[in-house]
Amino acid sequence: MGPMAHRSHTGTGPSQRQLRVGELIRRTLADVLNRGEIHDPELNRLSITVGEVRCSPDLKVATVHVMPLGGKDVEEAISLLSKHRGELRHHITRQMTLKYAPDLRFRPDETFDRLDETRRLFSDKTVMRDIRGGGEADED
């Protein structure tokens, strides 16, 4: 059996390992931020939600989707997290046994924006009528 023998994932989405490692990184970062383990008063005054972490197939890059409470100060939060990238990586390596500590890249979590848009759509009168079956439905 060669080194590629364990590769059974052939789909286009993330593998189970990518999902599992991403979730472990998400939990670790959320815990570190909640406990204020990064000694930066500017960062600790922000209540940051770690929404999702997506890992590259080789697990060397982790894209961390974050949002400060209330959706304000997003750029400041990303800047502060990026500034403390090394310390955050250190916390991850202490919690997990990975061959490489992933490079952390911080991005705004737009899940909340999509959720607001979905709520807005569901409150639209036309959409509500269609959901209740009062609209004309096209049969395909």
Curated annotation (Swiss-Prot):
InterPro entries: KH_dom-like_a/b, RbfA, RbfA_dom_sf, Ribosome-bd_factorA_CS. PROSITE patterns: RBFA. SUPFAM superfamilies: Ribosome-binding factor A, RbfA. Pfam families: RBFA (PF02033). Signal peptide: none annotated. Keywords: Cytoplasm, Ribosome biogenesis. It is found in: Cytoplasm. One of its GO terms (molecular function) is ribosomal small subunit binding. One of its GO terms (cellular component) is cytosol. GO terms for biological process: maturation of SSU-rRNA. The keyword DNA-binding does not apply. Monomer. Binds 30S ribosomal subunits, but not 50S ribosomal subunits or 70S ribosomes. PANTHER family: RIBOSOME-BINDING FACTOR A, CHLOROPLASTIC-RELATED (PTHR33515:SF1). Belongs to the RbfA family. One of several proteins that assist in the late maturation steps of the functional core of the 30S ribosomal subunit. Associates with free 30S ribosomal subunits (but not with 30S subunits that are part of 70S ribosomes or polysomes). Required for efficient processing of 16S rRNA. May interact with the 5'-terminal helix region of 16S rRNA. This is Ribosome-binding factor A.
